Amino acid sequence: MDVWWPDMQELASDHNVRYTGVIIENYEDATDGTIKKQKDTRRFQYFGNMLLHQGGELGYHGYNHQPLSLSNADYGDVLPYDTWKNEAAMKKAVKELIHFGEDTFPGVSMSVYVPPSNVLSAEGRKMLAKDFPEIRTIASNYFTGEFAYVQEFEVAKDGIVEQPRIISGAIIDNYMKMAALSELNMHFVNSHFIHPDDLLDEDRGAALGWEKMKGNLADYMDWLVDSAPSLRQL
């Protein structure tokens, strides 16, 4: 992180990009409603405040990394997740996440929710809209994927803004280029998601090394500015 984060900040500054960072309070696997509060907030504040200082925003990813799904979801061997015991347990976890964000970043408005691994059940989606007015935007997947919550760019009937992410990672292959170009043509929109641990995962480019991955991101941002100079940075 001592190299990756300063480089990411430099990319944002050089290309006038404002990041959205989303919070996971912990990586505990409990889905029965048991809450273990995160007491060490130093790293959250360190990275979060730098992101805010650069003009970015903070949002929500999860109390833990367990998607908001009940026992009627069967991930099989596809995803290594558990389901929640009941809706009350899901609600308790999201409530804790929001309290954690408020306590860690007092006075900072957060409205974006990014589902863990892009998985969000119908029950979880309904609960967010009904019980958590703080969440005004959901950012999941534009393209289909197994168990993925797939979105169009729209305002849903319940008022939540559906704002899918189009591409992700630092392996800028032909498929990603086609997807990005298609969305510029259709909606004149671009959105991109990157995990801090992409550079540790071979499937997401670790074998390339960070310098190559960083170069890919810089080239992509250059292309975006050249191809769509009037695109607003929101």
Q: Where are the regions that the model predicts?
A:
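Catalytic-face loop-and-helix region of soluble metabolic enzyme cores
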Residues: 160-161, 166-174, 190
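C-terminal domain-boundary segment and adjacent tail
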Residues: 13-23, 102-105, 132-153, 194-234
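Aromatic-lined glycan-binding groove of carbohydrate-active enzymes
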Residues: 138, 180-191
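Active-site-adjacent substrate/metal-binding segments within catalytic domains
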Residues: 1
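Alpha-helical scaffolding within the catalytic cores
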Residues: 4-6, 39-49, 144-151, 169-181
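Metal-dependent polysaccharide deacetylase catalytic core of the NodB/CE4 family, i.e.
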Residues: 14-123, 187, 192-200, 204
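Substrate-binding cleft/loops of secretory-pathway carbohydrate-active enzymes
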Residues: 35, 119-162
